Amino acid sequence: MALNKEDILTWLEEAKTSEVVELITAIEEKFGVTAAAVAVAAGPGPAAGGVEEQTEFDVMLVSFGDSKINVIKEVRAITGLGLGEAKALVESAPKAVKEGVSKSDAEEIKKKLEAVGAKVEIK
């Protein structure tokens, strides 16, 4: 009985890891090959002078403006910090409120802080 590719793939999906390892070892011995990853030549990179798009952003509190208390409340809501920690963060502006967030999250945080009078930058 000849096996086709689908039969082999179905068996691999259902096989235990130890069975797959045994199969790989048997193939290596039978054909004198190794299962090491093959180094592939890198394809063409981005266009010359292209800039990689940033995926993580930091939300920086530049200043708290005229409504320090409201900014502290919003910083607490955004970060989950305690009152003293949030107050220290706000008073030490310019300071990162959140680091390594997505662009949409950074924009949302910026809107919330600006709504209570803070000056905010996204880096």
Curated annotation (Swiss-Prot):
Keyword tRNA processing appears in the UniProt entry: no
Highest taxon listed in the record's lineage: Bacteria
Any single biological process term in GO: translation
SUPFAM superfamilies from the UniProt entry: ClpS-like, Ribosomal protein L7/12, oligomerisation (N-terminal) domain
An example Gene Ontology molecular-function term: structural constituent of ribosome
UniProt keywords, alphabetically: Ribonucleoprotein, Ribosomal protein
GO cellular component, as recorded: cytosolic large ribosomal subunit
Xref: InterPro entries: Ribosomal_bL12, Ribosomal_bL12_C, Ribosomal_bL12_C/ClpS-like, Ribosomal_bL12_oligo, Ribosomal_bL12_oligo_N_sf
Keyword Ribosomal protein appears in the UniProt entry: yes
Function statement: Forms part of the ribosomal stalk which helps the ribosome interact with GTP-bound translation factors. Is thus essential for accurate translation.
NCBIfam families documented for this protein: L12 (TIGR00855)
Sequence similarity: Belongs to the bacterial ribosomal protein bL12 family.
Subunit structure as annotated in this protein's UniProt entry: Homodimer. Part of the ribosomal stalk of the 50S ribosomal subunit. Forms a multimeric L10(L12)X complex, where L10 forms an elongated spine to which 2 to 4 L12 dimers bind in a sequential fashion. Binds GTP-bound translation factors.
Protein name per the record: Large ribosomal subunit protein bL12
Organism: Borrelia duttonii (strain Ly)
